[in-house]
C-alpha cells in the first residue's frame, strides 16, 4: 500500500507507542542486530511511487488481483495465545493461511507435522504448500506466531519482482560464510525457489533432515544451506531509502532506540514507512498493531494510494 506521506507509519506509531509504554521494555539499549554495509548478498528495494503512477488503472487492477500470497505459520501448543492473536489479526490479509503445528491441537484447526523439530516442521510445511498450492500462489511467506506482518506492504514490495525467478527474501544475517534470512523477520520464497527447494528435499546429501552436522543449527540457517545448493541466495529487502522492511524486533524497541539515537527524529529515525514485519510481539501488542495499522486515521489527512490490493474473496480482514 503506497501513501502520499508517512501517514501509515504515524498510524502505526500512535497505536504501537502504547505497547512501549505499557510493557516498559527495559532500559537496555539494543542495536539493530547485525545489519552491515558490506554484505555480499543483494539489497532489493521496493519500487518508487513514480513507477506505479505510470501504470494504467486497468493494469493496476490486474496487478492487485494477480498477487497471491500463501502464508505459513509454524506453531506449537505452548503458543496457543499467540496463535489466537495472529489468527484474529493480520493473517486475515493473506490470500490463504495454514497453521502447521507440532501436534494436534483441539482449540484451533491446524496441519499436524508430528514433530517438535522446527527444521523438520519447516521442511514438511514447505513440501505440503508446494505440492498442494504450486499452481495457485506465486509467493510463499513463512513466519513465527510472534511476528506481525502487513501483507499489503509485502505485495507492494514484490510488485516488480518476477516470481518465476528464484527469490529468497527477508532480513538477512551473516554467519561465517553463510548468508541467510532470519526467520524472526519472516521468510519469503518465490514459486521458483519453492520448486528448487522441493527438488532437494529428497536428496539428503544436499538438504539433510538433521543438517548434516554434529551440532544442530537453526532452521533458518539449514534452509539457507539447502537453497544455496539450488542456486538461491539470501537477499535483504529494503524500502526506496535503504531501510530494512523485514524487522526482527518490535516497534516498541525501535521507538526506544530512536528516542536514544535520534531524539529529534523519532518517527523518521525509527523504521520504514513501508515496513512488512515486526517481531517479538505479545498477543495484546498484536491487537494494538492491528488497530494502529488498519483502523487509526488522522482526520484531515488524505490517503491517496496509487495501488490497492484487494482482500481475498470471503475474507474477514479489515
UniProtKB/Swiss-Prot annotation:
Transmembrane segments: 7-26
Molecular functions per Gene Ontology: glycoprotein-N-acetylgalactosamine 3-beta-galactosyltransferase activity
Cellular localization per UniProt: Membrane
Topology of the protein relative to the lipid bilayer: Single-pass type II membrane protein
Annotated GO biological process: protein O-linked glycosylation
Keywords (A to Z) from UniProt: Chaperone, Membrane, Signal-anchor, Transmembrane, Transmembrane helix
Stretches of the chain found on the membrane's Cytoplasmic side: 1-6
Side Lumenal, residues: 27-318
Family according to the record: Belongs to the glycosyltransferase 31 family. Beta3-Gal-T subfamily.
Cited function: Probable chaperone required for the generation of 1 O-glycan Gal-beta1-3GalNAc-alpha1-Ser/Thr (T antigen), which is a precursor for many extended O-glycans in glycoproteins. Probably acts as a specific molecular chaperone assisting the folding/stability of core 1 beta-3-galactosyltransferase (C1GALT1).
Oligomeric and partner information: Associates with core 1 beta-3-galactosyltransferase (C1GALT1), probably not with the soluble active form.
Protein name: C1GALT1-specific chaperone 1
Gene: C1GALT1C1
